[in-house]
């Protein structure tokens, strides 16, 4: 074999190529470790066509300090993205390299829709998140949602439907509860509490709705349609609670008469439609 010139040339050429490749790799590794490529800046900006109301660049930098390492070449972008997305009020982040020593981060901020259970909020995408409610604007009053874990999207969907149904009555939802039995209760802006009963659509949460939820919707629409006539016959009495679970109507609980009227009028029993 060693007398074969072609074989010897092939081996020599192969060794030469490997040697050059090793030298190139060593050179690249040496250059990559130069201080020139140490990350010197992190640019933080909002996603296109959005604004940041709760996320400050200073708070983000403080929160991610020491969370990931490396230089322009070696930084793990997925690890960096996860670090940024762990910052309160950050829903999603994208991270890219900007030559020669900068990371550019685009942040999508959480859009709070309601308070969720004990100590979380829920966003407009139907996702639960944790952040400081004390950072909300002073004039922002959020409704309060309660429900089992994993029902966030369903609760947001039902909230949107309820808001649409009660809008003609100049009422909005102040509190929405989905209990472990998947029955709903609502408190409206006028303080009236509604027992809505079980929602067939809640047994299989679907952000696009299910035909099985029709009976649930029908109960509410029946109440909304009847309310203008019913309220006109209450003689100024306040309804504290409405039970919509009856198959052919609903029952009302009335607040007690003021003391000055109690002697002139008997308390009326709950009405049923």
From Swiss-Prot:
Q: What InterPro entries does the record tag this protein with?
A: Cell_div_FtsQ/DivIB_C (IPR005548), FtsQ (IPR026579), FtsQ_C_sf (IPR045335), POTRA (IPR034746), POTRA_FtsQ_type (IPR013685)
| Topology term for the membrane | Single-pass type II membrane protein
Membrane topology, Cytoplasmic segments: 1-10
Gene Ontology terms: cellular component: cell division site; plasma membrane
Q: For this chain's UniProt record, which GO biological process terms are given?
A: cell septum assembly; FtsZ-dependent cytokinesis
Stretches assigned to the Periplasmic side: 32-273
Subcellular location(s): the record lists: Cell inner membrane
Q: Which residues form the POTRA domain?
A: 37-110
Transmembrane parts of this sequence: 11-31
Which PROSITE patterns would you find in this protein's record? POTRA
Highest taxon, organism lineage = Bacteria
Keyword annotations from UniProtKB, A to Z: Cell cycle, Cell division, Cell inner membrane, Cell membrane, Membrane, Transmembrane, Transmembrane helix
Its annotated function is as follows: Essential cell division protein. May link together the upstream cell division proteins, which are predominantly cytoplasmic, with the downstream cell division proteins, which are predominantly periplasmic. May control correct divisome assembly.
The record's note on quaternary structure and interaction partners says:
Part of a complex composed of FtsB, FtsL and FtsQ.
By sequence similarity, the record places it as follows: Belongs to the FtsQ/DivIB family. FtsQ subfamily.
Protein name from the UniProt record: Cell division protein FtsQ
The gene from which this protein is expressed is ftsQ
């Amino acid at each position: 074999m060693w007398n074969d010139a072609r074989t010897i040339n092939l081996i020599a050429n192969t060794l030469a190529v490997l040697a050059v490749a090793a030298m190139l790799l060593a050179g690249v590794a040496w250059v990559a470790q130069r201080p020139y490529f140490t990350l010197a800046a992190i640019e933080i900006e909002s996603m296109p066509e959005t604004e940041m109301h709760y996320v400050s660049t200073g708070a983000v930098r403080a929160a991610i300090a020491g969370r990931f390492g490396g230089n322009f070449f070696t930084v793990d972008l997925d690890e960096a993205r996860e670090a940024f997305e762990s910052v309160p009020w950050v829903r999603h982040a994208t991270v890219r390299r900007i030559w020669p020593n900068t990371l550019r981060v685009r942040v999508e901020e959480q859009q709070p829709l309601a308070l969720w259970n004990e100590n979380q909020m829920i966003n407009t995408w139907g996702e639960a998140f944790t952040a400081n409610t004390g950072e909300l604007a002073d004039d922002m009053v959020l409704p309060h949602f309660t429900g089992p874990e994993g029902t966030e999207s369903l609760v947001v969907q039902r909230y949107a439907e309820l808001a649409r149904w009660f809008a003609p009555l100049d009422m909005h939802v102040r509190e929405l509860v989905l209990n472990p039995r998947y029955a709903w209760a609502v408190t409206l802006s006028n303080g009236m509490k509604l027992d809505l009963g079980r929602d067939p659509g809640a047994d299989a949460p679907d952000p696009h709705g299910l035909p099985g939820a029709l009976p649930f919707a029908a109960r509410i629409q029946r109440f909304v349609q009847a309310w203008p006539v019913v309220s006109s016959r209450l003689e100024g009495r306040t309804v504290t609670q409405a039970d919509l679970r009856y198959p052919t109507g609903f029952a009302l609980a009335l607040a007690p008469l003021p003391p000055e009227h109690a002697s002139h009028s008997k308390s009326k029993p709950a009405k049923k439609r």
